[in-house]
From Swiss-Prot:
A motif ('KMSKS' region) lies at residues 637-641. Pfam families: Anticodon_1, tRNA-synt_1, tRNA-synt_1_2, tRNA-synt_1g. One of its GO terms (cellular component) is cytosol. CDD domains: Anticodon_Ia_Leu_BEm, LeuRS_core. It catalyses: tRNA(Leu) + L-leucine + ATP = L-leucyl-tRNA(Leu) + AMP + diphosphate. HAMAP family: Leu_tRNA_synth_B. ATP binds at K640. Its EC number is 6.1.1.4. The lineage of its organism: Bacteria, Pseudomonadati, Pseudomonadota, Gammaproteobacteria, Lysobacterales. It comes from the Bacteria. This is Leucine--tRNA ligase. One of its GO terms (biological process) is leucyl-tRNA aminoacylation. Disulfide bonds: none annotated.
Amino acid sequence: MPTEANTYDPQRIESTAQHYWDSTHAFEVNEHSNKPKYYCLSMLPYPSGALHMGHVRNYTIGDVISRYKRMTGHNVLQPMGWDAFGLPAENAAIKNKVAPAQWTYKNIERMRTQLKSLGYAIDWSREFATCQPDYYVHEQHMFTRLMRKGLAYRRNALVNWDPVDQTVLANEQVIDGRGWRSGAPVEKREIPQWFLRITDYAQELLDGLNTLDDWPEPVKTMQRNWIGRSEGLEIQFEVRDADNNALEALRVFTTRPDTLLGVTFVSIAAEHPLALHAAKSNPALAGLLTEMKQGGLSEAELKTQEKRGMDTGLKAIHPITNEQLPVWVANFVLMAYGTGAVMAVPGHDQRDQEFANKYGLPIRQVIALKEPKNQDESTWEPDVWRDWYADKTREFELINSAEFDGLDYQDAFEVLAERFERQGRGQRRVNYRLRDWGVSRQRYWGCPIPVIYCPTCGAVPVPEDQLPVILPENVAFSGTGSPIKTDPEWRKTTCPECGGPAERETDTFDTFMESSWYYARYTSPNAHEMLDKRANYWLPVDQYIGGIEHAILHLMYFRFYHKLMRDARLVDSDEPAINLLTQGMVIAETFYRKNPDGSKDWINPADVNVECDERGRITGATLISDGQPVLIGATEKMSKSKNNGVDPQIMVTKYGADTVRLFSMFAAPPEQSLEWNEAGVEGMARFLRRLWTQVHHHAAHGPATALDITALDTAQKAMRCKTHNTIARVEDDYGRRRSFNTAIAAVMELSNTLARFDDTTTQSHAVRQEALETMVLLLNPITPHTSHALWQTLGHPETLLEDLPFPKIDTTALVRETTTLAVQVNGKLRGTIEVATDAPREHIENNARTEPNTARFLEGLTVLKIIIVPGKIVNIVAR
């Protein structure tokens, strides 16, 4: 009869291990170590109230790396905190009629418990939430410094404005041009906003990517494209009104000055000063500008919207031909990008061509390929787009360009640049797609921007001795406006410069501000200043882990803020993280039923019975509650919208944390998508039960004697060889390859080999002890609770396994005395032979010929030759 001790009971095992870790403060670290430091960090979670499988995968990857690094002799920091400000708390406050702070802190309590149940080796003494004043006070300090240095400034910018709720909406809150809650048509409104001059660091951010050798190439490519460095000319176009009066000149940046003779009109943004000037005397234009203020500001929406425009009646003077070009307002030109004006070359720009064809504007060809590959490349048509029209990588020459005919791109660029610079009408310029970071949010639940507005002194930074500016947490939040805007006691204050009446800034910071420097605060969480000398001990982060969806915004601001802290002499390093791992998504099947109106009701996989074919593919599905069919959707990322998420807590309760951890590491390599499959989870549970039984069965035969490698027979040596080969594989998988699935597979192979090792001698017991100890230690980074318990079962005192060294390879064990060779006859496998690794050729040939099955196939044949591939194959050629 199995006893409680030798039955695999995950809840008991995990509770015991976690109690030991907590009571010994096992994972709290400091800087006073003679070991090399290693800082492993997974992106901090938003406290939504419940972990999802994406969290589990992310934090398990980080935990595996952290525990492995500790076993290889490193002083490892793995902290945790909460990205606690943001929109979801406001939405929950509206829905549940509870203050955002109360909702947030309650969720943190719940999620902390969930994380602890998974057994992560986290230094909880460094925990903080970004909504705590003793965190964001340092962010406010930094902002006031940036104001004084001119790196923080205020200007007007467009936002999505809900006129009913009287609030600014994020792009994702604009649905079909309407506010998500009020349903009112959204307006584009220009309001004052605070910005950080990230563009001052554009080139450094670009150059720094070349030093990030251990960041994924796709992330670096996305950042390069987002920074968008381009070299071109800025050219001035004189502008005249209908009465031929000169107006302010238009500045246009172009990377294609070679197409200048193809310009047939100029496009400007609806907010451009010239558009506003023209609208004063043109009611139709004024009406269009008002319409263009409707709808959202997201790039996706702007790309897909119908192209619209109107002639302003103004004329731009072509800087070479002096031709009068119409100036059009176009809804695809944005004031925030470049100069808000574009020289339109419809013959060689697809967007301009579509616009010109819609409004009947002239289209001219000014480029021809020198060596067209086919008829399409020899043909230019004004109403058909072909990619070669705009491809400057091909060899082409200018045509229809007067004195510039025959020039290629580079020659035309140089000639025109020299001409305009000589005339004072243009200059070479490096431009960036990157725009300054708008950090103002017209929301309540965020860090208050530390600025005071005085009628006399203007915008004044809050003095450092008056920081933090604390956000009041006990408020009634309705979603209409912000509580701090309507709270005169909080809003009204005194100007720190003149002592006169003044008001506080009621905008709060973009939550990317908090998540751009949190990693540094973990290094010195109780420091009076933003950071102290401990930061330079731990930074940069050695391993950062998070989704590739953060490639542009978070990871760009993360790098930028690190440079701000460096320039403030808070850190010594240039980049915040050495290695970046972008884990794949967790995906799952989707099921649904269609409603009469065409909408879909998504059904959770846990509520569905499925039928599968012999290959395991789903062929049918029914709803458990009514037995009726449901439709099978695509396999997609787990999400609330598709209702295909799996609650990690249910899985932990059902199978145990180690089983969930093991499956999440075994099902796919870290960078690839993981398809959730409960049958796979059950398979991992079976493996852990089998390992548990193996260890307890072995331990029941008493302690092992000391291993004497000189006394081992061939089978025992082969078993040791398998053990140490496994160490070598797993060490490479953990350390270099980060291939945890193959590490697990290697341990499973070792377990299976050991199960077939049925020798019962004293030395075989010692060999088995070594193999089991090895498996327990190799699995410890992934299944730490089970390893903690089994280590004691194998006769060791309770200890922190991470403080034990990772198993060492005995190279003498890898030297096999015998080797197995496959024997082929005319290329077909007929048998195997076991020979000494140093056996002479004659011995190998004789053994191969006389192998019983091989000998049968050689009867009546003449052996022509024997080919030996050392260590692998013997091929006998006969006829």
